[in-house]
Swiss-Prot record:
GO terms of molecular function: 4 iron, 4 sulfur cluster binding; ATP binding; magnesium ion binding; sulfurtransferase activity; tRNA binding
Binding-site residues, [4Fe-4S] cluster: C113, C116, C204
Protein name stated in the entry: tRNA-cytidine(32) 2-sulfurtransferase 1
Note, other: The thiolation reaction likely consists of two steps: a first activation step by ATP to form an adenylated intermediate of the target base of tRNA, and a second nucleophilic substitution step of the sulfur (S) atom supplied by the hydrosulfide attached to the Fe-S cluster.
Annotated motif PP-loop motif, positions: 38-43
Pathway(s) served: tRNA modification
Location relative to the cell: Cytoplasm
Cofactor stoichiometry and binding remark: Binds 1 [4Fe-4S] cluster per subunit. The cluster is chelated by three Cys residues, the fourth Fe has a free coordination site that may bind a sulfur atom transferred from the persulfide of IscS.
Protein family per UniProt: Belongs to the TtcA family.
Subunit-level organization: Homodimer.
Keywords: 4Fe-4S, ATP-binding, Cytoplasm, Iron, Iron-sulfur, Magnesium, Metal-binding, Nucleotide-binding, RNA-binding, Transferase, tRNA processing, tRNA-binding
CDD domains according to UniProt: TtcA-like (cd24138)
């Protein structure tokens, strides 16, 4: 059997993805999993790596790819379909006009991301339940977690981010994020190497003053002065000292 050569970048991605899966017990043998492929570099990178890990028998799972066509102007998934066909994975591209809902409900000048993501998430959860998926796989990476933590603190007054694994409020779906240790720059490099047929999000990309972009710039500026800043922020998510916070419920538990 001929050994398939993989790049240094893919090896690095494999290392951090398998580490996260092991550390947080994200995948079990025989799981029926649904990978959400948005058409962006992150989910493409995760799909390529996870498919390779299944092919070389690292994981014994049933992988299904789900893409939601939100009826945005200019959406063209022909190359995405070709890529998935060539990869040989089970997939479905489902069309729902969430774009029309967003345009109708969001006032001019406001960002679409919040409502758009809620509608997308609702369709993902529905599809997963209808098809009895054990896990929903999302492509959020280390930088997403870091930015989300700061956004929650700065704009919502909450300390929260994106956990590696969580169960939805109704208890029906388990969501996992195998790339919580992966840096975005490695996914950018991998996308260049693999030449993924990326579908840009014109809806969000046209809105320049998004909060996430501001936070990303803030982190980059801080990292320029101290390169350890991003990893320190990430490490803070697993190094919580409740006794040094102001949550009265937590303090009552600790003190009693």
């Amino acid at each position: 059997m001929t050994e398939i050569k993989i790049s240094k970048t893919e090896k690095k991605l494999r290392h951090y993805i398998t580490k996260a899966i092991a550390d947080y017990k994200l995948i079990e043998k025989g799981d029926k999993v649904m990978l959400c492929l948005s058409g962006g570099k992150d989910s493409f990178g995760l799909l390529k790596v996870l498919h390779g890990l299944i092919e070389d028998k690292t994981y014994d799972i049933d992988l299904h790819v789900y893409t939601l066509d939100q009826s945005q102007p200019g959406w063209d998934d022909s190359q995405l379909r070709k890529y998935l066909d060539n990869l040989g994975v089970s997939y479905e591209i489902e069309t729902k006009n969430t774009y029309g809902v967003v345009i109708d409900k969001v006032p001019e000048g406001k960002t679409y991301c919040s409502l758009c993501s809620r509608l997308r998430r609702g369709n993902i959860y529905r599809y997963a339940k209808e098809h009895k998926m054990d896990k929903i796989i999302l492509g959020h990476h280390r930088d997403d977690l870091i930015e989300s933590l700061l956004m929650s603190i700065l704009y919502q007054g909450q300390i929260k981010s994106m956990p590696p694994k969580f169960i939805t409020q109704d208890g029906e779906n388990t969501v996992i994020r195998p790339m919580v240790l992966v840096q975005e720059r490695d996914l950018i490099e991998f996308a260049k190497e693999e030449n993924f047929p990326i579908i840009p999000c014109n809806l969000c990309g046209s809105q320049e003053n998004l909060k996430r972009k501001k936070v990303k710039k803030l982190i980059q500026d801080l990292a320029h002065e101290n390169p350890k800043v991003p990893s320190n922020i990430l490490n803070s998510l697993s190094n919580v000292l409740p006794s040094h916070l102001m949550d009265r419920d937590l303090l009552n538990i600790i003190q009693n």
